[in-house]
């Protein structure tokens, strides 16, 4: 499932992040890529553990925690440290798939889901689209600042060359409580339906039954 979520960050949060970025130093982004992805990664990245990176991560994690749509779709068990990337004119990230396992904070995690949180307005740069390959073909994404895209970490994807301006984005990975993507989507759909049912009719017999199905599937599939 690929899902775009708008307004993950408030305007105040976005402005605070951009202010922190303006004061930050960036290093070669290839340093954090896998051995093969390193060959096609040409961007800059905020050093992990720097003061600005830690403050930005705190803002983003708080925003993700309160975002119901993100929580429903991702079912996060672990979230990798947030990477803040910078693409200037001529920079890109060629076709690659993310590492299946990543070591973060001395803990090995499985990458089920990738996400990109756009920090630059689309009109501030040309190029820089995130392109994701799937069985339905290739799709390009260039979202408003503060919007986020969730997509399977198993996909081939790339960032097109930036030809003007600067593209800032926050990137990370989720180990989900629900490993199987089809099971995650089933739970997402059920949760969406039961919320709609409750809004329209309240706590009815039908709502109770679908809530039972939802809870029992979550109990069956969750990996703690």
UniProtKB/Swiss-Prot annotation:
Fe cation binds at residues 96, 98, 157. It is an enzyme of class 1 (oxidoreductase). It comes from the Bacteria. Its cofactor is Fe(2+); L-ascorbate. SMART domains: P4Hc. Transmembrane segments: none annotated. GO terms for biological process: DNA damage response; intracellular iron ion homeostasis. 2-oxoglutarate binds at residue 167. This is PKHD-type hydroxylase CYB_2270. It comes from Synechococcus sp. (strain JA-2-3B'a(2-13)) (Cyanobacteria bacterium Yellowstone B-Prime).
